[in-house]
């Protein structure tokens, strides 16, 4: 008598992040992709009322990213993430470095944008209601020095977001290790 067929073992279900961490992750993801896309789009527009409106929206979203980043960092520092999924050391190191750089850019990109806007003499009024203080004094020469740094750091963040998504998709479709479920919104 032959032994019964035993299906191959599936990887153990990965522990999930907290609901708050998941909500903050996806809110930031949507805001970052939307703000970056708007920045690329509005950059090429001729000077017009529409362009000014888009710049205001871009700045509102940037300040929102900054505020949510402070919340996300505070949550992350006070709530341990779930245990990591087993993976080769180089992948774990690459994932860790990518996350650290993303967190740094969550703060750097909006702060450099705020400094640029302040130096250029364009105040930020968050959602048209809350005027924010200038980050640096008005100085057109300084604004021209800061502007490319906002663009470069935004491009670096976009590249890291693409790398982050590629890594998640690799785990989902190649490794099939359930890693992506750790941050997937709960199904009702």
What are these regions (language model features)?
Residues 1-188:
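Membrane-embedded alpha-helical bundles that constitute the cytochrome b-like, heme-associated redox core
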